[in-house]
Amino acid sequence: MKRNRFFLSLLFMVLIVLFVILFFTWLGRENIKNDSAIREVAKEEVDKLFSLYNKGEYAEIYDLSCDSFKNATARKDFLTVMETKMKILGEFKGRKLQYSNVINSKSVELYYRVGYINYSLIEEFNYIKN
């Protein structure tokens, strides 16, 4: 009798643990599904930046950046860096998303393998929803 009670208790504990695992797995997947919208917005913003880069509209890129970036980087310095980047790397050719991460459903980190005419590199983009 004690043995049966032990096995029933053990079975009950295992079922509770499985339920908890399944619940948190489901919860995590729901959050990932909900994050797809902000990921797409972030990707669209990166596409916009690459388009502006190829057109040489660096001031537009600066204007799209967040306030903390503008506080840390003078407009003139940014424009100089971007002009130098174009001279060294060349025009943007293409990119492939390597990794993305959503933080608190408001911030997205995107890591791309980016191809330019002269070089290929990994670039990180951070999108913060206002």
Report residues per predicted region.
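A short, amphipathic edge element
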Residues: 79-107
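Generic surface-pattern signal
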Residues: 51-55, 74, 83, 87, ...
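Exposed beta-sheet edge and beta->alpha loop/turn motif
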Residues: 99-130
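Secondary-structure boundary/capping signal
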Residues: 69, 73, 90-93, 120
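Short, low-complexity N-terminal intrinsically disordered segments enriched in polar/charged residues
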Residues: 4-55
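Short, solvent-exposed secondary-structure junction/capping segments
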Residues: 58-77
